[in-house]
UniProtKB/Swiss-Prot annotation:
Keyword Cytoplasm appears in the UniProt entry: yes
Function: Transaldolase is important for the balance of metabolites in the pentose-phosphate pathway.
Top EC class, one word: transferase
Protein name as it appears in the record: Probable transaldolase
CDD domains reported in the protein's UniProt record: Transaldolase_FSA
GO cellular component, as recorded: cytoplasm
Reactions it catalyzes: D-sedoheptulose 7-phosphate + D-glyceraldehyde 3-phosphate = D-erythrose 4-phosphate + beta-D-fructose 6-phosphate
A GO biological process held by the record: carbohydrate metabolic process
MF terms (GO), sorted A to Z: aldehyde-lyase activity; transaldolase activity
Record-listed E.C. numbers: 2.2.1.2
Active site (UniProt): K83
InterPro entries: Aldolase_TIM (IPR013785), TAL/FSA (IPR001585), Transaldolase_3B (IPR022999), Transaldolase_3B/F6P_aldolase (IPR004731), Transaldolase_AS (IPR018225), TSA/FSA_arc/bac (IPR033919)
Amino acid sequence: MKFFVDTADIDAIRELHELGMVDGVTTNPSLIMKSGRDIKEVTAEICALVDGPVSAETVALDADGMINEGRELAKIADNITIKVPLTWAGLQACKVLSGEGRMVNVTLCFSANQALLAAKAGATFISPFVGRLDDLNMDGMDLIAEIRQIYDNYGFETEILVASIRSANHMKDAALIGADVATAPPGVIKAMANHVMTDKGLDAFMADWAKTGQSIV
């Protein structure tokens, strides 16, 4: 499963990238706002750092506006993925932009029907939001399993990009189901390294080592 990092924080991306943990990056208007930087400037810097797909989101609500914004964003770098919402206008924009050979990430997906439409429209990625479904007392991972089954049934090439990830368990579940990609905040990816038994075992080793009075260097 590929790891995308969901942030516009250059330092956080660089730290994970140096460990080989970044296969791509996703951004959205909220993350750009949080960065406090110009969208084209920060996106260009991310694209120069990361070889994989970098999602930059349109903000127009009509298809023509999304298409025009998508084409403009695509000028930033060759690895730009144009992000559009899963609305009818977004599907129209996806069809045009993907037909031009551009990568398109259709976002804000909350149903298998929506994911099926996105695949038919030529989406490169579909981004189902699991955390927000969990907030509604639904199991967001059930949606990932449904989409995986549908895409496998018909050989769709659209990649399932699990989004709105809140925990390391979300990452594990996405991998078990067979998602192609999971995008998560830097903190969630780093939290995957944590386990209480690892900490407990390390504490025991350090206590015993101290008793030896030895030094390795």
